[in-house]
Amino acid sequence: MKSTQTPSGMPIHKYRPFHEQITVDLRDRTWPARRITEAPRWCAVDLRDGNQALIDPMSPERKRIMFNLLVRMGYKEIEVGFPSASQTDFDFVRSLIEEGAIPDDVTIQVLTQAREHLIARTYESIRGAKQAIVHLYNSTSVLQREVVFRTDRQGIIDIALEGARLCKRYEETIPETDVYYEYSPESYTGTELEFAAEICNRVVEVFDPTPERKVILNLPATVEMATPNVYADSIEWMCRHLDRRDEILVSLHPHNDRGTAVAAAELGYLAGADRIEGCLFGNGERTGNVDLVALGINLFTQGIDPQIDFSDLDGIKRTAEHCNQLAVPERSPWAGDLVYTAFSGSHQDAIKKGFEAMAVDAAAQGVTVDDIPWAVPYLPVDPQDLGRSYEAVIRVNSQSGKGGVAYLLKADHSLDLPRRLQIEFSGVVQAKTDAEGGEVTSAQIWSVFQDEYLPAPLDRVEEKWGRFELTSTRTSSDMGGSVSLDVVLRDGDEVREASASGNGPIAAFLQVLADQGVEVRLLDYVEHALSASGDALAASYVELEVEGVRLWGVGIDEDSSTASLEAIVSGVNRAIRRTVREPELAAV
């Protein structure tokens, strides 16, 4: 088939491909052959990079709530602010320290530019902390050098080195605090690799780390400029060209301008990085920082401990939404309201069968489903492991099929419909969704099921159930196995007693109906208890042929025999309603 696409007419001449701006040439790359086997070191930057991007920056109270959340989740390195840039950030850092809010195993991180008065203020803010990371940065990209700073490479190196020396000097003013260092060549992705390596190596010499006290070199995609594989190539290249690699933690800080921050972080980690900075749910400047939730749960679904607790994901989301005053989108990876929801009929059917297969496998092994590998189509994670329920997994609209409808009836009402009944009832629901549009809830599906197959609920007793209603039954059997059935049957407005015999209650009741002029043939019969308890209700499903019409009936009763007779009444009444309805429709 020939493509019919045409030129867009957009001004593509204004933009240069990345490879014409920055050369990243690593033809002997090794990262594609590697696998992720353990979690990286994490640093949550919600309170700094995330907060500065908010329309309504966090109040001190919301900041404390966010900090406490990050601590509870298990983050051990948390960037808490830019204390030299605002009094609010300075006061927040001081409150954490003075109020003893920082656990001993958590290290706060503070950001500073490479200017003396800002560095001095930064050290003043962390005085008294048990330990802290001072994060020094200056911009190194070609564009920033030419447009913002109007200086050459040496001028940028001088800024970084002077900043590093000042940090070492001011460290002496807070001997009670164990200070670690991080350096970021900001706009790294727009920086020539050889220059990025040169400036990083020069800064490392000033900080003079050891294998026991490593320095963090953060290589940010301040603006995402290329595909994730290019970022990974640059990280592997840098790891090869850092002079004191065993004394360095290589950190990633991807932004999401091109929508591939998660992929960039994962590939960059494969390429040799040790650490990743990001925000919960991808908050941050422009399109956001890399999403720490997506990264962590991606690991979890591969059987790798993220070392972060996501077991109350809805609670985490609610807290983040409160603090950021931003909603997490419904389709946000792993956390959105619709992530574990299937509307498609084929998806619903596959999910239903997946749950059933896991139950069978677990029973065969004599264990619970939590003790066997998770294997449900379209659900790469068990929602319950993240604190979600199965209630919203299957939702029904006009695109749904029998699987979703059957799943909801089984999950919410313990009704395990035979396959052909699933098909029949899904058509009833489909007609409703086609007529009314939108989503049909589980409660609405149950109401439709009752209206179609069961007597009217007690609060709707004025509504007629149909032509026939079984009001009482009594059975007896003789030594030859024949069953005698006595029933009280309402037929329209008349109530009459009837009796018949057969090789069982069902055969006898079919004879009762034949005596009333209704010919019924039984095609299939299925029953099950609605629970495992001894006093459980029984559900019966019968497939009938009534006056040449094939359809199903459903009965629910404490007595399984009575349930089967009620199922026959259900099917017969449905057949009669259908024959009455069709001429009316034809007349219209």
From Swiss-Prot:
List localization entries. Cytoplasm
Cite the entry's keywords alphabetically.
Amino-acid biosynthesis, Branched-chain amino acid biosynthesis, Cytoplasm, Leucine biosynthesis, Magnesium, Metal-binding, Transferase
Q: Where are the transmembrane segments?
A: none
- The EC designation for this entry is 2.3.3.13
Q: Where is the Pyruvate carboxyltransferase domain?
A: 40-314
Q: One GO MF term, please?
A: acetyl-CoA C-acetyltransferase activity
Q: What is its main location?
A: cytoplasm
Question: Where in this protein does the record put region Regulatory domain?
Answer: 456-588
Which GO biological-process labels does this protein carry?
L-leucine biosynthetic process
GO cellular component terms, A-Z:
cytoplasm
Known catalysed reaction(s)? 3-methyl-2-oxobutanoate + acetyl-CoA + H2O = (2S)-2-isopropylmalate + CoA + H(+)
The top EC class is transferase
**UniProt cross-references to CDD domains, sorted A to Z:** DRE_TIM_LeuA (cd07942)
Q: Where does Mg(2+) bind?
A: 49, 253, 255, 289
Subunit structure, per the record?
Answer: Homodimer.
Sum up the protein's function in the record's words: Catalyzes the condensation of the acetyl group of acetyl-CoA with 3-methyl-2-oxobutanoate (2-ketoisovalerate) to form 3-carboxy-3-hydroxy-4-methylpentanoate (2-isopropylmalate).
Q: What is this protein called?
A: 2-isopropylmalate synthase
The organism named in the record is Clavibacter sepedonicus (Clavibacter michiganensis subsp. sepedonicus)
The gene is: leuA
